[in-house]
């Protein structure tokens, strides 16, 4: 985990298995009754003279990156809406750049107020796999993967 330092890292050790995850993306963050997701849709490799403002300009001027980002944000808002009080899912911070050692990511922060009685299992089931991993349409993509692949992916790319 030290060699691939990332803001969203964890390790689970069990008697029968271990899981290590290092990701720049916050798929789920629960703070009291509030749930937050920060989908990443857009990656730009750093070059010598690049900075956040040049990365933001690139993303905003790139139709493909912008459309993909909007698509993933819409999907994550929809996923959150299944576990949140109607009308509470909102974009807190839209289309900004996060800087990492070797690259820039295009990010949006989305939050909502959880429905009463919502469990972490319900939340995870609603959000997994993350939109930036699987793409749109999520359900159909998963169906196609299940038809083509012989084994279930289980723990895969943060999902």
Stretch-by-stretch model annotation:
Residues 1-159:
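Extended alpha-helical targeting/anchoring segments
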């Amino acid at each position: 985990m030290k060699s691939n330092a990332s803001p969203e890292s964890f390790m689970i050790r069990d008697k029968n298995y271990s899981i290590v995850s290092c990701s720049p993306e916050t798929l789920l963050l629960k703070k009291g009754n509030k749930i937050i997701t920060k989908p990443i849709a857009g990656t730009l490799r750093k070059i010598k003279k690049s900075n956040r403002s040049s990365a933001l300009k690139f993303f905003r001027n790139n139709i493909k990156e912008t459309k993909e980002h909007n698509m993933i944000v819409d999907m994550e808002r929809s996923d959150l809406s299944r576990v949140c009080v109607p009308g509470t899912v909102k974009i807190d911070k839209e289309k900004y750049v996060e800087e990492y050692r070797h690259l820039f990511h295009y990010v949006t922060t989305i939050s909502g107020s959880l429905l009463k009685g919502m469990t972490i299992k319900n939340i995870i089931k609603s959000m997994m796999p993350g939109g930036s991993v699987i793409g749109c349409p999520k359900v159909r993509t998963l169906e196609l993967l299940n038809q083509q692949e012989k084994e279930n992916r289980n723990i895969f790319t943060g999902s």
